[in-house]
Amino acid sequence: MTKREILQRLKGQLIVSCQAYEDNPLYGTENMVTMAKCVLAGGAKGIRACWPENVRAIRALTDAPLIGINKVMPSADTDFYDSVFITPNYESAVAVIEAGCDVVALDGTLRGRNEKELTELVQRLKAAYPDIVLMADLATVEEGIICEKAGFDILSSTLSGYTRDT
């Protein structure tokens, strides 16, 4: 699919997040595939999945637009509200792109980095993967303005409530 086709298929549609942490009974790739089957059967037109192994398995199931994230959770001594953890760097983005996502969602907040670093990450990904759709997970209007200028294709308020500013 082209970027335009992906964006058109997602516009105004239900996107369901299929993810679970290790301490959740639904944790595991097999369960995420089952969850994806259920949400698609229920009418979802897109899926958001975490970690390369889940993205790869769900991609094998469907050609529905797939948003990939690669959470890198902060260490116990790092404050959650100060951490960039949703696809925080180039390597984590490449892992879910190579696993088969159509859209890669990145942390679009400025926690732990500045606007220039975020813009450079976007430019590097666009140069290496010109057909991938880039989604900014952000928390504030100000971050939305910065992310739009940086070149993200989709802006989402996913992190509202998960940062010190919100």
Per-range role (PLM):
Residues 91, 96-108, 112:
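Ordered, amphipathic secondary-structure segments that act as subunit-interaction surfaces
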Residues 26-29, 48-68, 76, 84-88, ...:
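Active-site-adjacent beta->alpha loops and helix N-cap segments on the catalytic face
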Residues 1-26:
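N-terminal amphipathic alpha-helix/helix-capping segment at the start of soluble metabolic enzymes
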